[in-house]
Amino acid sequence: IHNNLHGTGTGPVLFTSFSFDPSEDSLLIIPRVVIGQRNGKSWITWIGATPQPALQEFIPNADELTLAWSGSNGDVWQDRVARSVEKIKSGELEKVVLARFVTATSDKAISERRLLSHLADEYPSTWVYSHHGLVGATPELLVRLNRSLVTSRVLAGTIRKTGDDERDLALAGSLARSSKDLEEHEYAVRSVADSLSPLCSSMNVPESPFVLHLSNVMHLATDVTGVLT
């Protein structure tokens, strides 16, 4: 390994992704090429005996892309929400996480690099990822291990931003006081803490969440940390 910088993030980098389903395989990925930037300095890390790759190879295509969207209709979604609420009221369930898909089609190839670049620009405080066509940006951190310190960022409880700073500040305050969102958040934090506790000699679970501001929404967030045994 030849490393002339010796800074955080330089040299080979390993990324991991763990499935919520224990029967599914997890992933360990060492990228062939990493372009990094920190404190005004940029660098490139590549694996192999070949010469340094040309940066032009990684510049996203600037062609315009038109997408057509399709997905489930509002009535179906509202029905699912109503049935989930009834199950919670009856005590059958404590929490439900609903998801719906939207299909985007295009007559041109969709550049993953361009999509990643756009996500990184729009959501600078999130983790952006791409693997075998799975591309996204998430503010939630399942687990991070730094020496013996393990960290998990839990998000639960969300409100949409309006774009008006004064109005959004008031909405952030209402989110932080919402009994419904606080109960939902506590459930998620407890689930993570209970999973990490058997693996740690000590843990820190904050009593109250903070409000994480993204470009389009705000989340209740808690950073659960522990020292591995």
What is each model feature region?
Residues 27, 32-34, 133, 140-144:
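Short, surface-exposed charged micro-motifs
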Residues 59-141, 183-188, 192-195, 199, ...:
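Active-site pocket-lining segments that scaffold enzyme catalytic pockets across diverse folds
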Residues 2-103, 199-201:
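Non-catalytic accessory segments adjacent to catalytic cores
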Residues 15-16, 99, 130, 144, ...:
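Short beta-strand segments
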Residues 28, 44, 135-136, 152:
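Generic recognition of long tandem-repeat/solenoid scaffolds
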Residues 38-53, 57-60, 67-69, 144-223, ...:
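Cytosolic ligand/metal-binding cores
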Residues 1-11, 90-117, 151-164:
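Short N-terminal secondary-structure initiator segments
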